Amino acid sequence: MKFHLAINLERMNPDTDMTAVRDHTLEMVKMAEAGGFDVVWAAEHHALEMTIAPNPFQILTWWGEHTSHIRLGVGVVNAAYWHPINLAGEAAFLDLTSSGRLEFGVGSGAYQREFDRMKPGLDQRDSWRYMQESLPVVQKLWEGDYA
């Protein structure tokens, strides 16, 4: 059996200081590693009241600097918000700096209100097309130069 933990930099009370939230998430990541968990996951969300998570690669890079063996999972990035070259590069760099600990996850998004802010005019139900288009490109970029 494998154990995974999804952690968001979220606060349930707007009076909670984000520094405390940040510190609490790092503490949970360290506890997960010490407790034998296999993967910790960070999500991508934009302009939601309860969380700050605009780039899971940044969060995971930070967690990776404070851990040694737990795998670092992107759960998930929204393909509609990323150019495939940026997505491939961010993922490859995190995998490099974490000594191969990246678990890559990409999806089509969860909340229409995020699409309204990030990709106005795109219906969340149609965003799978971005994923379908970008995944083969990302894979080719990881294999080498791709035009």
Language model region names:
Residues 46, 77, 108-109:
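Conserved beta-strand edge residues that scaffold enzyme active sites
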Residues 1-67, 71-72:
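N-terminal beta1-alpha1-beta2 module of alpha/beta enzyme domains
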Residues 70-76, 103:
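A short, small-residue-rich loop immediately preceding and capping a beta-strand
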Residues 50, 74-82:
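Active-site nucleophile and cofactor-binding loops and adjacent substrate-binding regions
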Residues 2-19, 81-147:
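Flexible, glycine-rich active-site loops centered on histidine and acidic residues
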